[in-house]
Amino acid sequence: MVFARVNEADVTEAILDGFYSSLKKHLRSDVIVVGAGPAGLTAAWRLAEAGARVLIVEQNNYLGGGLWLGGYFMNPVTIRAPAQRILDELEVPYEAVKPGLYRTKGPLLAAKLAARALEAGAEVLNLTMLDDVIVENSRVAGVVVNWSPVQGLPRQITCVDPVGLRAEYVVDATGHDAVVTRKLAERGMVEASKLGPMWVERSEDLVVEKTGEVYPGLVVAGIAVAEVYGLPRMGPTFGAMLLSGEKAAALIGEKLGLKVKVAAAPASQA
């Protein structure tokens, strides 16, 4: 016999115990990051390595968001300077296309970024959708979540109540949906705009500039920033996603009294 003697119940018990212990530990987190795209994973990585208890909530079964495809059906992705410094730290190889513009493999960057966030200590609830937010004393205090496939079932045949998870801070890194912020906007608690037409150069700068707290306890990062503030669409380039996630982590880290690391200067600006 090649493998150890283990039966079906042993396997199920191992999965169940691991899930239970992780979920129980993160019923109360320092930070809940909603969305496991490039901005969310970067924020989770930076906060977790600084010592924060971080939970990532992702509606899909996979992590990485749009990083798997760089545009249309093609999987090379582009990064504009100075964001390649994060690729240097992740040890993701890239090539210079022209001064200030770099190209790398999307699946490799997605895998490396997800691995780094998890290695730093962040936990993930995948196949988990945001249903609502917890607001207490005019401050976001957590999220309300459910199993993602529930939303695809007719109301007539299912009634599955969501559950609440608390956190000191929530990061809306849900991309074009900006779903966390829009839950508040639907109630008139914040204003949320619509995405403008594409303008890569302007959009990336503005996304990083506008990354921040949109409501007490809620920080918006990544393309969700463009959606909330009506910024130009940035198109298939990812530098602002990485730097926005890093900035979100730094802002929250400062509030929590944590020293959040920022990547070193780029190895190359060629």
From Swiss-Prot:
Annotated NAD(+) binding lies at: A39, E58, Q59, G66, L130, D161, I223
Could you tell me which pathway this protein works in?
Cofactor biosynthesis; thiamine diphosphate biosynthesis
Q: Which reaction does it catalyse?
A: [ADP-thiazole synthase]-L-cysteine + glycine + NAD(+) = [ADP-thiazole synthase]-dehydroalanine + ADP-5-ethyl-4-methylthiazole-2-carboxylate + nicotinamide + 3 H2O + 2 H(+)
Q: Which residues carry this modification: 2,3-didehydroalanine (Cys)?
A: C159
Q: Which GO terms describe its molecular function?
A: cysteine-dependent adenosine diphosphate thiazole synthase activity; iron ion binding
Superkingdom in the source lineage: Archaea
Q: Please give a single GO biological process term from the UniProt record.
A: thiazole biosynthetic process
NAD as a keyword of this entry, yes or no, is yes
What kind of modification does the protein receive after translation? During the catalytic reaction, a sulfide is transferred from Cys-159 to a reaction intermediate, generating a dehydroalanine residue.
Gene3D superfamilies reported for this sequence: FAD/NAD(P)-binding domain
Residues involved in Fe cation binding = D161, H176
The prosthetic group or cofactor this protein requires is:
Fe(2+)
Quote the EC number.
2.4.2.60
Q: Where are the transmembrane segments?
A: none
Q: How does it assemble?
A: Homooctamer; tetramer of dimers.
* Role noted for this protein: Involved in biosynthesis of the thiamine precursor thiazole. Catalyzes the conversion of NAD and glycine to adenosine diphosphate 5-(2-hydroxyethyl)-4-methylthiazole-2-carboxylic acid (ADT), an adenylated thiazole intermediate. The reaction includes an iron-dependent sulfide transfer from a conserved cysteine residue of the protein to a thiazole intermediate. The enzyme can only undergo a single turnover, which suggests it is a suicide enzyme.
What family does this belong to? Belongs to the THI4 family.
What this protein is called in its record is: Thiamine thiazole synthase
What species is this protein from?
Aeropyrum pernix (strain ATCC 700893 / DSM 11879 / JCM 9820 / NBRC 100138 / K1)
- The gene name on file is thi4
